[in-house]
């Protein structure tokens, strides 16, 4: 069967049938109601923006969010799975602006804020049905009908409560700070928004070395370097490093001041006229390069500890309105902070020559003007990492803006303490990416000068400036005397009321909440706490589990932690998982424009959702690493997991139907067949391992272990049990085999349920169970079946088989030719004899013999571990190496090696076996040495030929779509070599194929025909049909 679905079973169609069953039987709802009154397992589902269709990042996160609840449900817990929609903020506004053709904020104001917000409300759930269909097709169970929306009044009211709580605890203030600012969206961004995803990306800009003329020395200039020439109109100071040396050099008829440490990068053989420290330059005055002198405190040299001697000139131009370090320095020296840039990123009339021009577009003109006035020393284009808006992709600026802030810096100690109580996956995130971020938490600007969002609940008096913060709709209504119908602007701004301190009127301040503040309030806002569901919230907070991709350590994870710490002094979650990013096959970001990734819905309809689930969750992306995704990885899963397991199931069903077997549940005690015991050991070990690795959320190990079990079942247990199953009749031994198989298949389906929910459901149904596998408890496999000694024996046998096959391949001896014998040393004789028959059948060997030793085939060698010995032995290493190669060493009583007068400790060398030089028919694996008799005589060649003939005829049976029990007629048409083969092996060939008649002439109306190349003789034609005598 191909993974695309041609053949006996098409897995995507099978999944569609399972989906129909779940919908019809309300299986998800049953799984919730069946656990009523049980302990609740809480996981927070980070609400996606509903402004587009799901991508592979959403899909990966959703699969994890499905595995965990399914698993916890099977452990007996109730796991509510409520969906949520992130409705507010720049993502939605930006999409509406694009749809309406708006270019600026002014367009919105002219259109009307109320109408604009109505458009936002309409857009928000435009893709809701598409999301629902997509998530359902993935097989993820979630409650869409009870979804919360951040735009609902109930949710927003809780957001207001959270802000007021933070305010009342002293964690909120209003102030002007340097913050990331988008001139296109005309709003503040938080410091973590400026670092989301790939917000910092390469950008080419013009940098300039500008000459600032010293006030009292017209021929002398301070040389300063800037990468933002547009900030020069706001310059008020030049900063130098107090302890560094600065020099004044001759440059034509001019003199230039710069750091001595920066000379080499700018001048070849400078003539130094003066030398002093930066501290000695402090206080000198200069003339502005753009505009006029601002006031007496400006345009002077000051010292700063952030001035570095790397790139540039060692003199930094200071514009306090456009840099955090600049602003702090301005406060220190009481410098003015002129801001000649409007909200839309154009220069104001304060800079007449550039008024109305975009700051970036004006840069070339600024530089041209500096050049014409003789103040431009040098300009060059640089490529640097520069922050961009996470929604509109325009470059950000850092700008002094009035905003409402959460005092996150004051919460650092509590944030660190709360983080210490969280289990992070990967573990390094705890003290690394997330830990570093909260240890250096900066105050969070939570207000946005936008329209579509929960309102900042602050009212200010127009006369005395008194401020009131509202934490509920009831408070607003009580003060305004009007009913609150909608908390959105402009409706909320109709609520004005008298000031209690004077005769003034209180009106709401402008601005709405950062949408990250709203999503960070999700744990309580989604429950409308504290206005409703108080007990429910308190009993389910903090969450047991959350998962998002790694960048959310500076997004949703962070905002939840800040708000929870500030409001409740509590960590909001106990376990947090961060996954990596899924890149296209070519290693680039997935792009609709580049079409460098397969459509996920098409992929699921081609290979199935379970296959995509395994391909993603088994990959390193679940350990926080980025991966390159390709459709081949999904196709490979179908081959390695689906097909093997499904074929095992069909094999079981076919033969149990033939034998009219019905499982009793009695496995038989004690188990007298070693293969039965081994299969049940593997099942019990699998269940134990899954539980262990679910504790650490190591999905890659779980899926790897699942694959191991499928291989043990398919290529070991069933393969070695074929003779046992194929024999006629249903004796006790065969019945036990069937009982063990049924037990293993049904319990494996239950173990598989959280990880491959569609396949598990289909298999469980095929086994005759009426109830869904997802309504079952987690299986408890009897620990009496665990036998790691037996597992080690089986592992050794598989390794031995692999070694024999490798020696065959190396010597060009086909696996189809039987060997007279192999001899094995390094294994217990009893163990080898116990499994000799298995090995003879699997390896196509006449006789497996035990050997007491392997001295004539292999010799011991000592391998020194140079990485450990090199430093310790030094010059003596050479003599030791020579002695060991010559065999001139002894092993002492402690297991150490003594050579050339040096003692090598046991951990500093290894003792290995190696094949003797003259032998090519010997293999070594673990401590076993196997010798193969590779002499293939005529009789062995005939056996090999008839085995190949049988294999090809079996293929014809499949091609003709004949059942296992149907008898056939075959024709084998060839020369004398075929006659010779059939003389010796005709009866065996007929027994293998259920042959009624074997003819040496053409069949009438054959169902299938083929041509076979045998090791010797001419090509052989083979034909097959359903037996006419059957």
Swiss-Prot record:
Localization terms from the record: Cytoplasm
Residue positions of motif 'HIGH' region: 48-58
UniProt keyword terms in alphabetical order: Aminoacyl-tRNA synthetase, Antibiotic resistance, ATP-binding, Cytoplasm, Ligase, Metal-binding, Nucleotide-binding, Protein biosynthesis, Zinc
Q: What is this protein called?
A: Isoleucine--tRNA ligase 2
Q: What class of enzyme is it?
A: ligase
* Enzymatic reactions: tRNA(Ile) + L-isoleucine + ATP = L-isoleucyl-tRNA(Ile) + AMP + diphosphate
Further details from the record: P.fluorescens NCIMB 10586 possesses two distinct IleRSs (IleRS-R1 and IleRS-R2), each with a different level of sensitivity to mupirocin. Purified IleRs-R2 shows no sensitivity to mupirocin even at a concentration of 5 mM, 100'000 fold higher than the Ki value of IleRS-R1.
> What's this protein's function?
Catalyzes the attachment of isoleucine to tRNA(Ile). As IleRS can inadvertently accommodate and process structurally similar amino acids such as valine, to avoid such errors it has two additional distinct tRNA(Ile)-dependent editing activities. One activity is designated as 'pretransfer' editing and involves the hydrolysis of activated Val-AMP. The other activity is designated 'posttransfer' editing and involves deacylation of mischarged Val-tRNA(Ile). Confers high-level resistance to the antibiotic mupirocin (pseudomonic acid A), an Ile-analog produced by P.fluorescens NCIMB 10586 itself that competitively inhibits activation by Ile-tRNA synthetase, thus inhibiting protein biosynthesis.
* SUPFAM superfamilies named in the record: Anticodon-binding domain of a subclass of class I aminoacyl-tRNA synthetases, Nucleotidylyl transferase, ValRS/IleRS/LeuRS editing domain
- Its quaternary structure? Monomer.
MF terms from GO for this chain are: aminoacyl-tRNA deacylase activity; ATP binding; isoleucine-tRNA ligase activity; tRNA binding; zinc ion binding
The Gene Ontology biological process annotation of the record reads: isoleucyl-tRNA aminoacylation; response to antibiotic
Indicate which residues form the motif 'KMSKS' region.
Answer: 589-593
Does the UniProt entry include the keyword Oxidoreductase?
no
What UniProt notes about the protein's domains is:
IleRS has two distinct active sites: one for aminoacylation and one for editing. The misactivated valine is translocated from the active site to the editing site, which sterically excludes the correctly activated isoleucine. The single editing site contains two valyl binding pockets, one specific for each substrate (Val-AMP or Val-tRNA(Ile)).
